[in-house]
């Protein structure tokens, strides 16, 4: 990948040098929509943060532009904690995905600036390396079991040693996670939500057969993961977890809607399949009970939706006390800016488990030059000061915002379900 072009400077001792003089919101669509905040100090150092919220990008962009940017100008970029507290506590209507994604963009941009001022990569600021590379998992999918198995083989050839597997459900026209026409899977595909039809009994029938075949074809040398995408009741999720036990999954993700944390008590009582949840969480309060009661094995929050590095660090520390590991969301609905910051976090955090990783489009990689690299099943962050990702604004301007929304789901009788 091309290297970030932003210049660095020695650590600035003057508060005037650190004064924020500009903060701009950039919305671009190099294959999909991304929202980026770019902050500049008086000394000319810039930092970037991701604020992308899939299907609700302009809501976060407006929140940033109207509520946060005016309050950034004139502040000391080095006072990261104080700025985080100002925006979190100052928002009477606190938490929620829009607020926390906007705060995250500010927070990550400020950490990026701090790394550049110090001349240090972000992982060093956090406390240094805990590992040489972050284990990542890719996404293999197919219209049926055989096609998914072939895709798993292709991902193994690319070097992945952990792979999420999804397959089409017989009798269902469109299944979550299944790409069309050989293109990467992208659920936000139209200006208005598309409707999909779902059958839980059909799904519960095919998934165990999928993993039985994958173990037969690929053995025990790879880690296999699966995402139920919030579609099951607690007892249905418990049944699936039990049925998957012979195939030793790395985890079963988002088995049931996560609003009711106590629902996971039922799942936990019936299966030893490891559980992961949290990509829709926005704060520690969304998962406090899950972690305290050890109802999950992996927490899936993402830096961009959970208030940035400052808050996610607290969440990870809390999880470590209860032997819960990180497994951050990392699909292409987050920009390379978020991936870069997450990778530095993964390199440092002691209770790391795994990192989701989907390949961004060539257009997105060009708009967001970065220094992280994939080798032998792991992502390796670079040594560029900050988080190592920049934005090419001239190139970003060539890709204007395109309205796209996530689908909705109905059961076979027409009842609304959880997509």
UniProtKB/Swiss-Prot annotation:
Transmembrane intervals: none
Cofactor(s) in the UniProt record: Mg(2+)
Gene3D superfamilies assigned: Enolase-like C-terminal domain, Enolase-like, N-terminal domain
Annotated positions for site Important for activity and substrate specificity: 331
Family classification: Belongs to the mandelate racemase/muconate lactonizing enzyme family. GalD subfamily.
Pathway the protein contributes to: Carbohydrate metabolism; pentose and glucuronate interconversion
Cofactor note: Binds 1 Mg(2+) ion per subunit.
Binding site for Mg(2+): 227, 253, 279
Protein EC: 4.2.1.8
Top class in the EC scheme: lyase
GO BP: amino acid catabolic process; carbohydrate catabolic process
Source organism: Xanthomonas oryzae pv. oryzicola (strain BLS256)
Protein name, per record: D-mannonate dehydratase
Residues reported in the UniProt entry to bind substrate: 54, 139, 279, 300, 329, 333, 356
NCBIfam families in alphabetical order: ManoateDhtManD, PRK15072.1
Lineage top rank: taxon: Bacteria
Keywords linked to the UniProt accession: Carbohydrate metabolism, Lyase, Magnesium, Metal-binding
Single GO MF descriptor: mannonate dehydratase activity
List of catalytic residues: 176 (proton donor/acceptor), 229 (proton donor/acceptor)
Function of the protein: Catalyzes the dehydration of D-mannonate. Has no detectable activity with a panel of 70 other acid sugars (in vitro).
Reactions catalysed: D-mannonate = 2-dehydro-3-deoxy-D-gluconate + H2O
């Amino acid at each position: 990948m091309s290297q970030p072009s932003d210049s660095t400077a020695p650590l600035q001792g003057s508060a005037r040098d650190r004064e924020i003089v500009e903060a701009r919101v950039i919305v671009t669509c190099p294959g999909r929509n991304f929202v980026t905040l770019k902050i500049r100090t008086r000394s000319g150092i810039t930092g970037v943060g991701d604020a992308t919220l899939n299907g609700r990008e302009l809501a976060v962009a407006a929140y940033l532009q109207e509520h946060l940017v005016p309050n950034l100008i004139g502040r000391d970029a080095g006072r990261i904690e104080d700025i985080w507290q100002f925006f979190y506590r100052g928002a009477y209507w606190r938490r929620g995905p829009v607020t926390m994604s906007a705060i995250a963009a500010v927070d990550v941009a400020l950490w990026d600036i701090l790394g550049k001022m110090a001349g240090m990569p972000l992982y060093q600021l956090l406390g240094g390396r805990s590992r040489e590379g972050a284990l990542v998992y890719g996404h293999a999918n197919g219209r049926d079991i055989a096609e998914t198995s072939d895709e798993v083989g292709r991902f193994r050839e690319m070097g992945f040693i952990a792979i999420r597997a999804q397959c089409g459900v017989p009798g269902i026209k469109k299944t979550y996670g299944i790409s069309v026409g050989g293109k990467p899977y992208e659920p936000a595909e139209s200006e208005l939500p598309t409707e999909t039809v779902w059958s839980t009994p059909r799904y519960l029938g095919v998934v165990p057969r999928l993993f039985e075949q994958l173990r037969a074809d690929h053995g025990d040398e790879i880690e296999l993961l699966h995402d139920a995408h919030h579609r099951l009741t607690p007892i249905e999720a418990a049944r699936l977890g039990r049925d998957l036990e012979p195939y030793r999954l790395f985890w079963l993700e988002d088995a049931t809607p996560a609003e009711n944390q106590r629902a996971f008590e039922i799942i936990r009582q019936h299966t030893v399949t490891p559980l992961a949840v949290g990509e829709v969480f926005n704060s520690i309060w969304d998962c406090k009970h899950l972690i305290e009661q050890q109802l999950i094995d992996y927490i899936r929050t993402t830096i961009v939706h959970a208030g940035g590095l400052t808050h996610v660090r607290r969440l990870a520390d809390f999880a470590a006390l209860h032997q819960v590991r990180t497994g951050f969301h990392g699909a292409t609905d987050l920009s390379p800016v978020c991936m870069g910051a997450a990778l530095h976090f993964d390199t440092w955090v002691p209770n790391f488990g795994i990192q989701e990783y989907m390949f961004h489009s060539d257009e997105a990689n060009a708009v967001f030059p970065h220094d992280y690299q994939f080798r032998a099943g792991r992502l390796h962050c670079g040594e560029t000061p900050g988080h190592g990702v920049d934005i090419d604004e001239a190139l970003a301007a060539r890709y204007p915002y395109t309205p796209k929304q996530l689908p909705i789901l109905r059961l076979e009788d027409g009842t609304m379900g959880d997509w």
